[in-house]
């Protein structure tokens, strides 16, 4: 990592390695996860895989005479930033030794089970504390370090580095020989030992996933309803990892940190794609309004990451981040905004048996009117903020498209006569005669304000009721009328919004 960058966030999670004979039929390997500015690194960590690791395995010696933990090489080589969130009682849950007067750095000599430091799964006996909330402790005395740690609030950011050469000194520290500043836990939280699972095919070397427009999603599994799983995929779809955290809070914290780092790349990605989009010269290649990953709920019950790119007129979908003009010009699916509507908080029967559950409160449906009917797709996002942003952008995009297009025409038949129906956002509905060789004649004109109801038969017929003498007129559009129905609704919605803004 280049000098000058902040220390990465690190912690121990579990990596799914493949099928096995244990619970859930899956094999898991304990790994060290390191979140840097531009990449997520998964490194091998020693220890048997299991659904709930013991604190002693994660944080160092917990019994008198126990040996210090065997830590992954990647952890020995780097400075790390660890955020500790203290409970109302119990403090950080560490003891320290060393100090300038002892010609030693400030070292963690003991970690109490169940307290805040232990729960991070990212601090170890033998870690040197380099700073506390940005305050340098590299030359602090023991008392200065104690005071710096005591005056912290509920959230403490420690910068640490593991000191392999001094960790044997604390081999028997759990027996009570350490001099600590934190009160020992009154009633330490106990965790039940986990039965080791079958030996997986271990990760043999570090795996790096670029964070540039990467996809990250919190998940459940059919055998574990707690959303403590993370799926992370590189933007090109080539590198992917499926991780298990100790609980939902840990998974949420990691997902938030990873998403925040990914978010720093979005302005650059938008600029790159904007240049490619402009170079394609295709219709609708205006400014990019929004870009991001959605999780599509497939009809089979599974899910798939889908990259959505919103322009002024279209919503484009890709399986991976386009890297060329050719890739950008070939989306897997395109939805014209003027014929698309969105809805969320749907009432549904839930995912099918064996599928990955998802949060219906963070889901929304996209419905697009086409010549073959209504094309419906269900997506989910990771946070209420994402849902609000996509919903707002889609509604605004629909209105922008309506205001930009202004008018749409289609061939039809009315009372047996070939006609052309024009729908204009300001002028309303106009029927023109379209007999071969005949002069263009206006047969009917009605403003939007006169429209009392519209409906269709889902096959070819469009019904427009203007009241008055004409009543309901029936138009045969010779194909599924859903596209025109959605466009009429978009014009109406844009007009209502316009009136609301002017009121």
From Swiss-Prot:
GO molecular function: actin binding; calmodulin binding; structural molecule activity; transmembrane transporter binding
UniProt domain PDZ: residue ranges: 81-164
Source domain of life: Eukaryota
Membrane topology value: Peripheral membrane protein
Domain SU: 447-503
Compartments reported by the entry: Cell membrane, Sarcolemma; Cell junction; Cytoplasm, Cytoskeleton
Phosphoserine: residues bearing it: 95, 178, 183, 187, 194
Domain comment in the entry: The PH 1 domain mediates the oligomerization in a calcium dependent manner, and the association with the phosphatidylinositol 4,5-bisphosphate. The PDZ domain binds to the last three or four amino acids of ion channels and receptor proteins. The association with dystrophin or related proteins probably leaves the PDZ domain available to recruit proteins to the membrane.
Assembly with partners or alone: Monomer and homodimer. Interacts with MAPK12, TGFA, GA and F-actin. Interacts with the other members of the syntrophin family: SNTB1 and SNTB2; with dystrophin protein DMD and related proteins DTNA and UTRN; SGCG and SGCA of the dystrophin glycoprotein complex; NOS1; GRB2; calmodulin and the sodium channel proteins SCN4A and SCN5A. Interacts with MYOC; regulates muscle hypertrophy. Interacts with DTNB.
Family: Belongs to the syntrophin family.
Protein name as catalogued: Alpha-1-syntrophin
């Amino acid at each position: 990592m280049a000098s000058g960058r902040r220390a990465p966030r690190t912690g121990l999670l579990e990596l799914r390695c493949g099928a096995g004979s244990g619970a859930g039929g899956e094999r898991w390997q304990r790994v060290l996860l390191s979140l840097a500015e531009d990449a997520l690194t998964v490194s091998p960590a020693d220890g048997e895989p299991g659904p709930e690791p013991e604190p002693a395995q994660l944080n160092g010696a917990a019994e008198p005479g126990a040996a210090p933990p065997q830590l992954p090489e990647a952890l020995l080589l780097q400075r790390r930033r660890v955020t500790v969130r203290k409970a109302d009682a119990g403090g950080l849950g560490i003891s320290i030794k060393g100090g300038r007067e002892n010609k030693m750095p400030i070292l963690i000599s003991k970690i109490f089970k169940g307290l805040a430091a232990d729960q991070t799964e990212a601090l170890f006996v033998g870690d040197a504390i380099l700073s506390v909330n940005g305050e340098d402790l590299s030359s602090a005395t023991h008392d200065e370090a104690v005071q710096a740690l005591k005056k912290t609030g509920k959230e403490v950011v420690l910068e640490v580095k593991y000191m392999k050469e001094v960790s044997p000194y604390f081999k028997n520290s759990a027996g009570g020989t350490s001099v600590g500043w934190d009160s020992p836990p009154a009633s330490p939280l106990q965790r039940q030992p986990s039965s080791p699972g079958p030996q997986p095919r271990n990760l043999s070397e570090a795996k790096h996933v670029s964070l540039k427009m990467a996809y990250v999603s919190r998940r459940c599994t059919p055998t574990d309803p707690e959303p403590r799983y993370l799926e992370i995929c590189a933007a090109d779809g080539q590198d992917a990892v499926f991780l298990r955290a100790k609980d939902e809070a840990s998974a949420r914290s990691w997902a938030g940190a990873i998403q925040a780092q990914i978010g720093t790349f979005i302005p650059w990605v938008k600029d790159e794609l904007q240049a490619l989009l402009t170079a394609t010269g295709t219709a609708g290649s205006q400014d990019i309004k929004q870009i991001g990953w959605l999780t599509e709920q497939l009809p089979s019950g599974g899910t798939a990451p889908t990259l959505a790119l919103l322009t002024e007129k279209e919503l484009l979908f890709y399986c991976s981040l386009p890297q060329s003009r050719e890739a950008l010009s070939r989306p897997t699916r395109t939805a014209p905004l003027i014929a698309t509507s969105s809805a969320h908080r749907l009432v549904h029967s839930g995912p099918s048996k064996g599928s990955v559950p998802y949060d219906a409160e963070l889901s929304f449906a996209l419905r697009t009117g086409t010549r073959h009917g209504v094309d419906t797709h269900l997506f989910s996002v990771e946070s209420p903020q994402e849902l609000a942003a996509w919903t707002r952008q889609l509604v605004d995009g629909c209105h922008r498209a309506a205001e930009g297009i202004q008018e749409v025409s289609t061939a039809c038949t009315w009372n047996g006569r070939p006609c052309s129906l024009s729908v204009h956002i300001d002028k309303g509905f106009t029927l023109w005669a379209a007999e071969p060789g005949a002069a263009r004649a206006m047969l009917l004109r009605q403003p939007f304000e006169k429209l009392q109801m519209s409906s269709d038969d889902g096959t070819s017929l469009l019904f427009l009721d203007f009241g008055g003498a004409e009543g309901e007129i029936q138009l045969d559009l010779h194909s599924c009328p859903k596209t025109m129905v959605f466009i009429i609704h978009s014009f109406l919605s844009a007009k209502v919004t316009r009136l609301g803004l002017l009121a």
